[in-house]
From Swiss-Prot:
InterPro entries: Ntn_hydrolases_N (IPR029055), Pept_T1A_Psome_bsu_arc (IPR019983), Pept_T1A_subB (IPR000243), Proteasome_bsu_CS (IPR016050), Proteasome_sua/b (IPR001353), Proteasome_suB-type (IPR023333). This is Proteasome subunit beta 1. It catalyses: Cleavage of peptide bonds with very broad specificity. The keyword Cytoplasm applies. One of its GO terms (cellular component) is cytoplasm. Signal peptide: none annotated. The formation of the proteasomal ATPase PAN-20S proteasome complex, via the docking of the C-termini of PAN into the intersubunit pockets in the alpha-rings, triggers opening of the gate for substrate entry. Interconversion between the open-gate and close-gate conformations leads to a dynamic regulation of the 20S proteasome proteolysis activity. It holds the Pfam family Proteasome.
């Protein structure tokens, strides 16, 4: 029996910060295992990643990034930027391209500036204003393309991200739409909430 899993995660960058959003459903083949999984993982108090793919691979990569961020801070006396962490993660993924981590990750943060990046399992790295990962990507991207503007406020970006995840949940059977995990990161820090 072929096992299929899915999810939808999105990231949006605006002038005041970044918004990450994800559904909270975990599915395996035709079964919903839980409606309460967190798919956005804080790495520092200013950087987080979203998860699409192998849970074990993402958890291991998150632990590695947390350790690297602490080491960087102790060595240099300042936090690692989101761009630096994205490049580090890209290198880690690329070094393992022959035995890849089965993940697609959005990294978002606000250290010196708001930053969003999308990484594929082989280390391909794209910095953008908005992005999506997971099985519901085509549906989420359609909503993001229609609604994104450079002058969005952080609250407007949050509403757009929620709309994108919910649109994917209505059309992609592996994406849940009942509850959305949302993380906003601004110069003032990180805030997590769950929207029902």
């Amino acid at each position: 029996m072929e096992k299929k899993t899915g999810t939808t995660t999105v990231g949006i960058k605006v002038k005041d910060g970044v918004v990450l959003a994800a559904d909270t459903q975990a599915s395996l083949d035709h079964m919903v295992e839980t409606l309460n999984i967190k798919k956005i993982i804080p790495i520092t108090d200013r950087i987080a990643i979203t998860t699409a793919g192998s849970v074990g691979d993402v958890q291991m990569l998150a632990r590695y990034l947390e350790a690297e961020a602490r080491y960087y801070y102790f060595t240099w006396g300042r936090p690692m930027t989101t761009k630096a962490m994205a490049n580090l993660l890209s290198n880690i993924l690329n070094e393992n391209r022959w035995f890849p981590y089965l993940v697609q990750i959005i990294i978002g943060g606000y250290v010196d500036e708001p930053t969003i990046a999308n990484l594929d399992p082989f280390g391909g790295l794209i910095f953008d204003d908005y992005t999506a990962t997971g099985s519901g990507t085509p549906f989420a991207i359609a909503v993001l393309e229609e609604g994104y503007r450079e002058d969005l406020t952080i609250e407007e970006a949050k509403e757009l991200a929620i709309r994108a995840v919910r649109a994917a949940g209505r059309r992609d059977v592996y994406t849940g739409s009942k509850k959305v995990q949302v993380v906003t990161i601004t110069k003032d820090g990180m805030k997590e909430e769950f929207v029902v």
